[in-house]
Amino acid sequence: HIGAENPGHGRGKARGLAFVDALLAGTELDDEFPGIDIHVPRSVVIGTDVFDEFLEANRLRMLALRPSNDEWLTWAFLTAKLPAYVITDLQVFLERVRDPIAVRSSSLLEDSQYHPFAGIYSTHMIPNNHPDARIRLAQLCDAIKLVYASTFHTPARRYLELTPHRIEEEKMAVVLQPVVGTPHDNCYYPNFGGVARSYNYYPFGRMKPEDGVVSVALGLGKIVVEGGPALRFSPAHPQVLPQLADGKSFLEQSQREFFAVDLSRPERGPGVNPDQALVAFDLEVAERHGTLAPVA
């Protein structure tokens, strides 16, 4: 953890990860699924106190709170400096992590029960494979600053206007995690990724709403989060798959491409577009990698 704030006392993804990690430590899930390692990826949380310090030290708070051009605001954040102790800790982190890194937002207001903030703030991925450690550090610092800047971008402002909250209340922590996956040629991705929900609003057959529902897809979970074609099933009844009318319907509603981290351009740092480091491939590429058959 970077900063004085305890991640377990925070909000958003940071607190959720700390809770799940503690929960797994007190269970025997590994015994129930031999050969499968169930754990939370190694994570570093940059606390909201660092966010406050960054705004104050670079005199960004007043600029950030005023409605302004997103590009100008982003430039102001990118040219600002992170605290020296944060940079030192990030250097240590990069010495231990050589996989691609997900730089994720974890805001104070994310846990709002009636106003979900999913997709409002940025998550950036960096390939983390440049041979120069200084460039890898600079890319990581830029990704953190871009997450900070997204706190005050127009989409976030407009969404907050629909809630009882004000932008002055928001604070941003950042979660750094190695991307789970395996390198293949010039890309990096997991065998599958997805989202699990504890309540299924559309059960059928033997399914019960409280059984939950899982949506998974080959590669990174981006296609699932964006509502693209993915496989949905109940963890309690994994053999019960969606029943469609005919083979044509199955083909139309099946995944046709997958997303991976692009490893071919290590010199390319994070940009305004959070998906800049990602690349989409046809399924033929996964077949060549040997990753399609186990999940198809």
Segments (PLM) and residue ranges:
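An N-terminal structural lobe/cap that precedes and organizes the functional/catalytic core
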Residues: 30-40
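A structural-propensity feature for long, helix-poor, extended segments
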Residues: 41-90, 159
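Hydrophobic residues on conserved beta-strands that form the core of alpha/beta folds
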Residues: 40-41, 176
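Conserved mixed alpha/beta core segments that line enzyme active sites in large multi-domain catalysts
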Residues: 1-32, 81-296
